[in-house]
A protein has these predicted regions:
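N-terminal capping/lid subdomain adjacent to the active-site entrance of alpha/beta enzymes
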Residues: 1-185, 189-198, 202-206, 230, ...
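Flexible, glycine/charged-enriched surface loops at secondary-structure junctions
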Residues: 75-77, 113-117, 211-218, 290-291, ...
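A cross-family glycoside hydrolase active-site/sugar-binding cleft signature
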Residues: 129-131, 156-158, 185-189, 213-215, ...
Length: 362
């Protein structure tokens, strides 16, 4: 286990925190014949987005997972996933980091990318959404202009940290700046109550939003479903959808039409693919979110984005573009407003241990 902290290139303002540094827990798993796999859990400034932090991930893995994992068959990922779930309640980020390393091992042992083990990729690249979360209005507009010049055609505006009128004006000015040909989304990160969410979305309807993400607290599934039926903009569940069971509950209630996939909140790649399968069966679309991972964690999320058919809303795998540092020898690649497929063995990236040690905690 290695804990590390990597600053972002500019503060990232969200409804629940303003992020200046991302905290990481990196997991290294080695087999008896010397094969090594890596996993990552990225935490947004401690236990802010979820109950977990890099420190809690380390404790759970070192004390409750690693002791029984040693000596087990690393290729039996499903069996190990189920045993982790039995031995460790909750703590999906910790479990995901370990499972991620096991997938990396499995792909490397067979000489194939993880997406081949998930059924093969159904796309060669995934459209990339850039999140606008800049406190200073003019700086935010300039960032949007620069990203458009670089080929970005999808933006997500982080709301809920400001008064509603301020956020509505932000969206209006961003739409005016990027033009009608660029896709625009909004993410409240649970920042609104029911009346505020209804007022906000109706006020934002003139700006042609693709969707509004997680407008209400994660526990308010009834409110999410009711809200979705009262507005014309599609509603996406993120924090509300952390497991296959959550996905099933959301699908049964109806209304919400998009599910956000995240490997760490679903306790691993297998759990994430299960959420995607439920979405597909229920006729829902999917979007691959992020926790601002390095290229290592981004590569794991990308395997899902490439292999899961219902990922029709793109992704926000921009972590390596926002972080000031990375931990791999060759970062993930972007072109024409998309993140490109990785076809190397395992997760498709190789750890640069020198770079990792430079950002590791002392």
């Amino acid at each position: 286990m290695i804990l590390a902290d990597i600053p972002v290139k500019r503060p990232h303002a969200m409804s629940f925190t303003t992020l200046e540094v991302v905290n990481f827990a990196f997991v290294r798993v080695e087999t008896g014949d010397g094969l090594v796999g890596w996993g990552e859990a990225a935490c947004l400034g401690g236990p802010t987005w979820s109950e977990e932090s890099a420190e809690s991930v380390q404790v759970v893995i070192e004390r409750y997972i690693a002791p029984w994992l040693v000596g087990r068959d690393a290729s039996g990922i499903e069996r190990l996933r189920r045993e982790m779930a039995r031995r460790v309640q909750g703590n999906p980020f910790a479990r995901a980091a370990v499972e991620m390393a096991l997938w990396d091992l499995a792909g490397r042992a067979l000489g194939v990318p993880v997406h081949r083990l998930l059924g093969g990729r159904v796309r060669d690249s995934v459209p990339l959404s850039w999140s606008l979360a800049v406190a200073a209005p003019e700086a935010e507009l300039e960032e949007a202009r620069e990203k458009v010049r670089l080929g970005h055609r999808i933006f997500k505006v982080k709301t809920g940290a400001h008064p509603l009128a301020h956020d509505i004006e932000r969206v209006r000015r961003i739409r005016e700046t990027v033009g009608a040909g660029v896709a625009l989304r909004v993410d409240a990160n649970q920042g609104w109550d029911r009346p505020t969410a209804l007022a906000a979305i109706r006020a934002l309807e003139p700006y042609a939003l693709d969707f509004v993400e997680q407008p209400l607290p994660k526990w308010d599934l009834d409110g999410m479903a009711e809200l979705a039926r009262r507005v014309s903009v599609p509603i996406m569940a993120d924090e509300s959808c952390g497991s296959p069971q959550d996905a099933l509950a959301i699908a049964r209630l109806g209304g919400v039409s998009i599910l956000a996939l995240k490997v760490t909140k679903a306790a691993g790649i297998l759990g994430t693919m299960a959420v995607a399968r439920i979405a597909e069966a229920a006729g829902l679309g999917c979007y691959v979110g992020c926790m601002i991972e390095t290229s290592l964690g981004t590569a794991a999320y990308l395997q899902v984005a490439l292999a899961a058919a219902p990922v029709t809303w793109g992704c926000e795998l921009f972590g390596p573009l926002l972080l000031k540092g990375d931990v791999v020898r060759r970062p993930v690649s972007y072109a024409d407003g998309a993140i490109l497929a990785l076809d190397g063995p395992g997760l498709g990236v190789d750890i640069d241990e020198t770079a990792l040690n430079e950002c590791a905690r002392r």
